A protein has these predicted regions:
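Nuclease catalytic cores that cleave nucleic-acid phosphodiester bonds
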Residues: 53-143
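Domain-level signal for Mg2+-assisted phosphodiester chemistry and nucleotide/NA-binding surfaces
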Residues: 1-83
């Protein structure tokens, strides 16, 4: 009887690490990020924002063109709904490298549209969520 209870235990939520460009998707392509992720993943998930990604968004919100500053500010507001994870990384570490290390450590998926980062993640068998045909989200890899 105990074994039956184990079979029906809920799975832990999927961890999804967000790259900065993933947070721009709702504003650039008018896509409801949360409902698209709900439809795509079909189970509980937890959005994770790493401190280097947040710092990158804050830098974009304070510098650059008016359009970029506005988009970055909106992305930061959306990022408030995510679990914030503080990483202790050297200043010289690239954001992409921090994302890759965190994905390995947390055994998490990554949501990014960066082709180079997607390729690097797929090379180490990390599932990647990305925007397909500017209209919907897709997964590359096994969840």
């Amino acid at each position: 009887m105990v074994q039956l209870g184990l079979m029906f235990r809920q799975k832990a939520p999927l961890k999804v690490i967000l790259d900065s460009n993933a947070l721009f998707v709702p504003f650039q392509f008018k896509i409801d990020l949360i409902s698209e992720l709900d439809n795509l993943l079909e189970r509980r998930y937890e959005l994770i924002l790493l401190s280097p990604v947040k710092q990158e968004l804050e830098a974009l919100a304070s510098k650059g063109s008016l359009k970029m500053r506005k988009a970055a500010s909106c992305a930061l507001k959306l990022a408030e709904k995510c679990r914030q994870v503080e990483l202790k990384v050297p200043e010289t570490t690239l954001v992409d490298d921090a994302i890759i290390e965190a994905a390995k450590d947390f055994r998490a998926m990554v949501f990014t549209n960066d082709r180079q980062l997607r390729r690097r993640l797929r090379d180490i068998s990390v599932p990647v969520i990305y925007l397909r045909q500017k209209s919907r989200l897709a997964i590359d890899g096994l969840v």
